[in-house]
Design a protein with these regions (language model features):
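A generic structural signal for tightly packed, nonpolar segments enriched in small/aliphatic residues
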Residues: 1-229
Length: 229
């Protein structure tokens, strides 16, 4: 619903698809297991119910992330990046070396404004991995488009009080600033892929019925096979 920054009723109607990133992550992990991929795989699924109650976060509240970073809540409807940030932190804990973190999320409307509903936005800090994914997206007719981790936009995430803004304050480039926010929780520049997706077909088209859509699975599956298997 958006929490205290509540969505209009029309904006809530499709929110049953807001678990699309988790669905894709679970599906991809299931396929990798069934195909007996020779990788050490960890699946993490952060889940939140974002409704109004006496315990609701307020805009401009400051909370501490799992790694103790102070984060100012710019908009309570942007809860996904908060739980993703903590999950990225959790994924790097322990003594096992992490070679790659992939996250899937129905994160921003800005990605839909940039690319429409049928093409997820891809971000990565590793050009080779990004190219491998994009090449396989073309081969398997599973379209993604890379957007930049434009470093100059980092300044939009830093508040005057020294905290990290969860949403930034530029008003534009929201998919990029959301990705930059998540990137701040990587340690030692670990290889990372972020997929900002719709997870839903608004209309019927051949092979893609109206409803939930498992976009990016084929592209990532074949890319991982090429990179690691």
């Amino acid at each position: 619903t958006g929490g205290l920054d509540i969505k209009p009723s029309s904006g809530m109607l499709l929110m049953k698809k807001d678990m699309g990133g988790s669905a894709v992550a679970i599906a991809l992990a299931k396929i990798l297991i069934e195909l007996n991929f020779k990788i050490n795989l960890k699946l993490l699924v952060p889940i939140a119910e974002n409704s109004i109650s006496e315990k609701s976060m307020r805009p401009m509240d400051v909370v501490f992330s799992r790694n103790k970073t102070p984060v100012e809540i710019g908009n309570t409807d942007a809860e996904g990046r908060l739980i993703l940030a903590d999950t990225i932190t959790f994924a790097q804990e322990g003594e096992t070396k992490v070679d790659l973190i992939i996250d899937f999320a129905t994160l921003t409307g800005a990605a839909r404004v940039a690319l429409g509903t049928e093409m997820p936005a891809l971000f990565s800090n590793n050009k080779k991995i990004a190219k491998t994914i994009l090449d396989n997206s073309l081969k398997k007719n599973d379209p993604l488009w890379e957007l930049p981790l434009f470093n100059a936009y980092q300044r939009f995430l830093k508040n005057e009080n020294g905290t990290l803004s969860s949403t930034g304050f530029s008003g534009t480039g929201g998919a990029i600033t959301a990705a930059l926010f998540l990137q701040k929780f990587l340690k030692n520049n670990v290889n990372w892929v972020h997929v900002d997706m719709m997870g839903w077909n608004l209309t019927d088209r051949p092979g893609y019925p109206k409803g939930g859509e498992a976009s990016s699975i084929r592209a990532l599956l074949y890319a991982l096979n090429e990179l690691f298997n």
